[in-house]
């Protein structure tokens, strides 16, 4: 796993946690992007690809 893939995995976990805590997707996405150095499009794509 590359560093970018690892960051994306962590960001996806963070995004899902914030959504589970009641944040709406746009706010959770912004908080995650502010906290972690990941590409917005890659994170949204990973989120949309979840089962």
Report residues per predicted region.
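C-terminal alpha-helical interaction appendages
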Residues: 1-51
């Amino acid at each position: 796993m590359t560093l970018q893939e690892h960051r994306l995995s962590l960001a996806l976990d963070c995004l899902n946690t914030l959504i589970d805590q009641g944040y709406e997707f746009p706010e959770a996405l912004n908080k995650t992007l502010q906290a972690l150095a990941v590409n917005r499009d890659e994170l949204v794509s990973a989120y949309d690809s979840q089962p």
